[in-house]
Amino acid sequence: MMQTKFIIQMTLETRPDLEYFYCGEGKSGAQVFELKKSRAKKYDTMEEVNRDAFILQAVHKASGETYTVLPIRCRT
């Protein structure tokens, strides 16, 4: 979990353009995945962010990697 917190902090510092992302802790370590607003629309609620994070989590699970998902809204 410390690795995840470190990666979240680094993402906040190095990617100020990211409004939404989720951090996954999987078998191969922690990783940050961008939730691309441009793909569909701007998110209005955290429920929409969580839904997309859940969909992406399912995609990674299909590839054999399992992530514990922490959705984060880092900008207001």
Where are these regions (language model features)?
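Short aromatic-glycine-(Arg/Gly/Cys) micro-motifs in beta-strand/loop hairpins
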Residues: M2-R39
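Short, mixed-charge low-complexity intrinsically disordered segments
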Residues: R39-T76
